[in-house]
């Protein structure tokens, strides 16, 4: 078992342990010994794990209800959120009760936002079941849904009281979801995580599957270190958005047919190409990045137009009036923050 403590405004632990899902009450009882519980999941994850988690919670004396919505990024919207919160109200949940987000990034984002806003905030636990959620989105307290204007534009910062990651749940993931998570893992490799790039270069995906718990722990520790410095993303936490400025534009323009990790991979390459043009990154580092991404069977190009990507960037959360904060790779394994105008941003895609 690996336990990583995050000293945020609401301190909590990230527990990474094989088989932990079967002992979920052992971790929740000390935090919430007696309450009503709502388990939020989606149509992909629920058939695998919902019944067993619900039975374990009920056996431990909890009153449990559940809410399952259609899987996919297209469900992460205001209408689905309101339906969830209305259901929570219909179940008479109180501020003393608990929400469990059982699923990947979409489940965690939307369920977390419901927990942040229902009755002005109730406790919640993240139980990530996708690689992307395990290494990134379940940690740090960012919650949100998408709007017509862009991705993650309606949300709140709300730290969970626990993140419980059972790597055995990743065994049911299709290959696409493994690759999706690898997009975010490669991102961490460009944020000075020691040895991560070397490991990914040696045996892409195969090594990752064999040592997934250690890789998850590396990424979570890296994110924890950043979140503890800058919980609400006023400074260094923006580094975690490497590949996201262009990546979010690709997701939105594709109507979310391009998955997040895939879009982040393309976004990293596009930003790196721009950095080479601006003299901020050498061409060899760009080629190594592209080779690493391709080795994980992720794309490095897109048919989405420059105009579409930049239109979405105008609604990026890091945009402030005429300027936007971007993350630029400046060497192989290292990236830096930079503030540019939207006109200057466009030159990175020329």
Question: Where on the chain are the PLM-derived regions?
Answer:
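ATP/NTP phosphate-donor binding region
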Residues: 1-97
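A glycine/threonine-rich phosphate-anchoring loop and its flanking beta-alpha core
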Residues: 15, 113-203
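Residue-level signal for inorganic ion chemistry
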Residues: 17, 39, 77, 128, ...
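Buried hydrophobic packing segments
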Residues: 84, 111-115, 185, 250, ...
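Non-catalytic interfacial helical region
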Residues: 85-99, 111-126
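Short glycine/serine/threonine-rich phosphate/pyrophosphate-binding segments
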Residues: 106-113, 134-135, 249
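C-terminal charged capping/lid subdomain of soluble metabolic enzymes
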Residues: 183-185, 280-350
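Active-site segments that bind and position negatively charged phosphate/pyrophosphate groups
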Residues: 199-307
């Amino acid at each position: 078992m690996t336990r990583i403590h995050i000293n945020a405004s609401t301190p909590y632990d990230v527990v990474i342990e094989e088989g932990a899902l079967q002992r979920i009450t052992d971790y929740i009882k000390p935090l919430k010994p007696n309450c009503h519980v709502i388990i939020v999941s989606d149509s992909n994850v629920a058939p695998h794990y919902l019944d067993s988690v619900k039975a374990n919670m009920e056996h431990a004396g909890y009153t449990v209800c559940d809410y399952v919505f259609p899987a996919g990024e297209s469900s992460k919207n205001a209408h689905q959120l309101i339906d969830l919160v209305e259901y929570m109200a219909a179940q008479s949940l109180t501020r003393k009760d608990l929400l469990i987000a059982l699923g990947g990034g979409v489940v965690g984002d939307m369920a977390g936002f419901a927990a942040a806003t229902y009755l002005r905030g109730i406790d919640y636990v993240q139980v990530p079941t996708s690689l992307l959620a395990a290494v990134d989105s379940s940690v740090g307290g960012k919650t949100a849904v998408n709007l017509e204007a862009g991705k993650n534009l309606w949300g709140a910062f709300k730290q969970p009281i626990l993140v419980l990651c059972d790597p055995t749940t990743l065994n049911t993931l299709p290959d696409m979801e493994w690759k999706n998570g690898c997009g975010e893992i490669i991102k961490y490799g460009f944020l000075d995580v020691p040895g991560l790039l070397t490991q990914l270069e040696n045996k892409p995906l195969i090594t990752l599957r064999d040592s997934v718990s250690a890789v998850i722990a590396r990424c979570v520790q890296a994110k924890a270190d950043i979140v503890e410095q800058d919980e609400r993303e006023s400074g260094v936490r923006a580094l975690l958005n490497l590949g996201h400025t262009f990546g979010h534009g690709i997701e939105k323009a594709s109507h979310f047919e391009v998955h997040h990790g895939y879009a982040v991979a393309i976004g990293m390459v596009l930003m790196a190409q721009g950095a080479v043009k601006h003299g901020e990154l050498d061409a060899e580092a760009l080629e190594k990045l592209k080779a690493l991404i391709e080795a994980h069977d992720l794309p490095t190009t897109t048919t989405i137009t420059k105009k579409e990507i930049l239109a979405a960037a105008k609604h990026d959360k890091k945009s402030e009036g005429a300027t936007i904060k971007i993350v630029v790779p400046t060497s192989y394994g290292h990236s830096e923050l930079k503030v540019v105008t939207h006109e200057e941003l466009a030159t990175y895609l020329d």
